[in-house]
Amino acid sequence: DAQEKRQPWLPFG
């Protein structure tokens, strides 16, 4: 997801 590139420190991955 694009959000992972912007905020890779979030547990979305």
UniProtKB/Swiss-Prot annotation:
Signal peptide limits: none
Keywords: Amidation, Amphibian defense peptide, Secreted
Residues with the Glycine amide modification: G13
Record-level GO BP terms: defense response; positive regulation of smooth muscle contraction
GO cellular component, one term: extracellular region
The keyword Flavoprotein appears for this protein: no
Localisation: Secreted
Tissue expression summary: Expressed by the skin dorsal glands.
Function noted in UniProt: Induces contraction of intestinal smooth muscle in isolated guinea pig ileum.
Entry's family note: Belongs to the frog skin active peptide (FSAP) family. Peroniin subfamily.
Protein name: Peroniin-1.1a
Record organism: Litoria peronii
